[in-house]
Swiss-Prot record:
It catalyses: L-methionyl-tRNA(fMet) + (6R)-10-formyltetrahydrofolate = N-formyl-L-methionyl-tRNA(fMet) + (6S)-5,6,7,8-tetrahydrofolate + H(+). The lineage of its organism: Bacteria, Pseudomonadati, Elusimicrobiota, Endomicrobiia, Endomicrobiales. It comes from the Bacteria. One of its GO terms (cellular component) is cytosol. (6S)-5,6,7,8-tetrahydrofolate binds at residues 107-110. The gene is fmt. Attaches a formyl group to the free amino group of methionyl-tRNA(fMet). The formyl group appears to play a dual role in the initiator identity of N-formylmethionyl-tRNA by promoting its recognition by IF2 and preventing the misappropriation of this tRNA by the elongation apparatus. It holds the Pfam family Formyl_trans_C. Its EC number is 2.1.2.9. This is Methionyl-tRNA formyltransferase. The keyword Transferase applies. One of its GO terms (molecular function) is methionyl-tRNA formyltransferase activity.
Length: 312
């Protein structure tokens, strides 16, 4: 098939590789290069890097001008596939291919519409998620569902492990969707159920609210594992004012009622230290203070950098 592929990030690259492996004819639309944080060097989108290496035609439009639209039309695509493109695709573009354009979304729509469905599902303690292939419309993730497949979420899953599972499931859903189109089947079902939203993450999302239950804080850790991580500032103790990132935590107990929350409660030999929550306690296993390497929480408390009774 002739496929118009919209994608940018490393996730998108995995899907482009799959299409290339299947010997489809591909034309890539990706985002412009971005300047590095320091210096003048430009960072290429992962999809562009793969396209250049494999002699796949691509464009990087800032906007979908008339010339860009004409270039896309001239490719005469059978369908369009969008995976983590990162920009809105206008109707005049997504309607160009014979079978329109579909998106691979990492949730069971209409749940978790938006840019960060995996992270928000984990933060809210969901036990099930999945992949949706759906036709792109002008609304946010509102189009008709072509295929949905479910995936159970393990309590040990974090954003990295769950994302890896969903990437593989999404590739399977993409291939099944393309096979439907190849057979001339392009039906879709309207989305049903109450929608929920998964907006882009911000650094402040990682701030721990100790007045929550231990399980809720653990879910926050799981969801924000890749970025921005979870953190808190010491408000009472030797390191007052220092921000601590929690690199590995566990639920130590889930139902104790604590008079105060955010208190370093106990040292647990060779494991770390516990912190009280509104209900329950978390066990800090690995941590990182500002501008320092990641260390064992047990070693940190042994070094008397933090003590029972200190407060976050």
């Amino acid at each position: 098939m002739r496929i118009l592929f919209f994608g940018t990030a490393f996730i998108s690259e995995t899907y482009l590789k799959e299409l290339h492996k299947k010997c489809h004819e591909i034309f890539v639309v990706t985002t412009p290069d971005k300047p590095a944080l320091r210096g003048q060097k430009l960072i290429y989108p992962a999809v562009k890097v793969y396209a250049v290496k494999n002699n796949i035609s691509f464009i990087q439009p800032e906007k979908f001008t008339l010339d860009v639209i004409e270039t896309i039309k001239n490719f005469a695509a059978d369908t369009g596939v969008a995976v983590a493109y990162g920009k809105l695709i206008p109707k005049v573009v997504f309607d160009i291919p014979k079978y329109k354009t579909f998106n691979i979304h990492f949730s069971l729509l209409p749940k978790y519409k938006g840019a960060a469905p995996v992270q928000h599902a984990l933060c809210r303690g969901e036990t099930e998620t999945g992949i949706s292939s759906f036709y792109i419309e002008e609304g946010l993730d509102t189009g008709g569902i072509i295929i949905q497949e479910k995936l159970n979420i393990s309590i040990k899953d974090n954003a990295e492990t769950l994302l890896n599972k969903l990437i593989l499931l999404g590739i399977d859903v993409m291939n099944k969707t393309l096979e439907l189109f190849r057979c001339g089947k392009c039906d879709a079902a309207s989305q049903t159920g109450d929608p929920s939203f998964a907006p882009s993450l911000k650094k402040i999302d990682g701030l721990v609210n100790w007045n929550k239950r231990a399980g809720e804080i653990y879910n926050q850790f799981r969801g924000l594992y890749l970025w921005p991580g979870i953190y808190s500032t010491i408000s009472q103790g030797k390191l007052v004012g220092k921000r601590i990132k929690f690199r590995e935590i566990e639920v130590f107990d889930s139902d104790s009622i604590n008079k105060d929350s955010g208190i370093v409660y106990s040292a647990e030999k060779n494991r770390g230290f516990t912190v009280s929550c509104a209900v329950g306690r978390i066990l800090v296993v690995k941590m990182q203070s500002e501008n320092k390497p990641v260390v064992s929480a047990w070693d940190f408390i042994q070094g008397r950098q933090i003590s029972a009774g200190d407060r976050f």
